[in-house]
């Protein structure tokens, strides 16, 4: 595993009486190192992902170049909504291309696994690379994506 740096930032939600959530930010040298770390983070508590229950997660952020495209995997709730556990995001304000992960057994525990080299890219370069990554998971099952991201290697 390549070296990574870790930072914790407090994210304070709006509203009274709500405890702040902390997001751990870690920097990785490669896409596969970041994806492996993200999946390991999701499974790092007492609960583990049952990949047979995974569904694809589609971006709902209209400002994203990946709007309405598959960007990750999650689980469907009883109410029918999809909770993402690992998704690939892009940020032009400091995190570049990164995986967002939520621990399955503690939804307040969050990880941003940043692809270090993408932070200093121009917005155009970053967007192009991000869309190449998104194209790579297009038309793939949630199980395929999970196995790829969990191991760092696309299933045969």
Swiss-Prot record:
Belongs to the ribotoxin-like family. This is Ribonuclease ageritin. It is found in: Vacuole lumen. In contrast to most ribotoxins, activity is completely inhibited by EDTA. Keywords: Glycoprotein, Hydrolase, Lyase, Magnesium, Metal-binding, Nuclease, Signal, Vacuole. GO terms for biological process: killing of cells of another organism. It comes from Cyclocybe aegerita. The keyword Metal-binding applies. Monomer. The active site is at residue 98. Highly thermostable. Has a melting temperature of 78 degrees Celsius at pH 7.4. Fungal ribonuclease involved in fungal defense. Highly specific and highly toxic fungal endonuclease that cleaves a single phosphodiester bond in the 28S RNA of eukaryotic ribosomes at a universally conserved GAGA tetraloop of the sarcin-ricin loop (SRL). The damage of the SRL inhibits the binding of translation elongation factors and halts protein biosynthesis, ultimately resulting in the death of the target cells. Shows antitumor activity. Glycans are attached at residues 100, 139. The keyword Isomerase does not apply. Its cofactor is Mg(2+). One of its GO terms (cellular component) is vacuolar lumen. GO terms for molecular function: lyase activity; magnesium ion binding; RNA endonuclease activity; rRNA endonuclease activity. The strong larvicidal activity of ageritin makes this protein a promising candidate for novel biopesticide development.
């Amino acid at each position: 595993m390549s070296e990574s740096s870790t930072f914790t930032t407090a994210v304070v939600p709006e509203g009274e009486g709500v405890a702040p959530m902390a997001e751990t930010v870690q920097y990785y040298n490669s896409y596969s190192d970041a994806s492996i770390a993200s999946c390991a983070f999701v499974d790092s508590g007492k609960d583990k992902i049952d990949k047979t229950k995974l569904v694809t997660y589609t971006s709902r952020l209209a400002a994203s170049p990946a709007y309405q495209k598959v960007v990750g995997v999650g689980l469907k709730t009883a109410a029918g909504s999809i909770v993402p556990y690992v998704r690939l995001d892009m940020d032009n304000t400091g995190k570049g291309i990164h995986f967002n992960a939520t621990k399955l057994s503690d939804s307040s525990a969050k990880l941003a696994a940043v692809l270090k080299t993408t932070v200093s890219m121009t917005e155009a370069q970053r967007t192009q690379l991000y869309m190449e990554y998104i194209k790579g998971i297009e038309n793939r099952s949630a199980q395929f994506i999970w196995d790829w991201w969990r191991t760092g290697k696309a299933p045969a």
